[in-house]
């Protein structure tokens, strides 16, 4: 029986890194508190996750399903590593991609209202190994909604990879199969994670400041 892969656990008292140690766009400096996960660490961890995914799912056609918008950077980098492994393997498998968008956030609080945008034609998932790629799992309600939708199409297997999982009292207890980092309950931005569409262009995962939320 498959088990969920371990993650890098970042403690509640993790101080992070001073902004001036990294290249941060000037227009964001006042809006950020600290760098929480540097880009290089994200990439190294993503490379390992790709190996875990291929070990678990690499025996059958994979459909990689990206959760937009926040998941696109992690999705692209994870797939690059998976494709590299696939190219250099004695037994390569076909891989296709699809996209879906879920809306559950308003400002820095989860509203509890989840809207599924797209996914009108997910019949291609039938009989396939489906890898859902998400940027962050907060309460877990959003992912549970998506999983119930995907399973209606009778895939052979469904696994979820998320770059981040928050430790929060609001969690419904859901945990993905592949997790990059388990983090404290802080509002983070960067590496395509946004705050009202800002900060997606940051390379690092950073903690937003109160000024940034204003």
Curated annotation (Swiss-Prot):
CDD domains given for it?
PRTases_typeI (cd06223)
Q: Where is this cross-link: Glycyl lysine isopeptide (Lys-Gly) (interchain with G-Cter in SUMO1)?
A: 115
Check the record and name the InterPro entries matching this protein. Answer: HGPRT, Hxn_phspho_trans, PRibTrfase_dom, PRTase-like
GO biological processes: GMP catabolic process; GMP salvage; guanine salvage; hypoxanthine metabolic process; hypoxanthine salvage; IMP metabolic process; IMP salvage; positive regulation of dopamine metabolic process
The molecular function terms in GO held by this entry are: guanine phosphoribosyltransferase activity; hypoxanthine phosphoribosyltransferase activity; identical protein binding; magnesium ion binding; nucleotide binding
> Which of the seven top EC classes does this enzyme belong to?
transferase
Q: What is this protein called?
A: Hypoxanthine-guanine phosphoribosyltransferase
State the gene name recorded for this protein. Answer: Hprt1
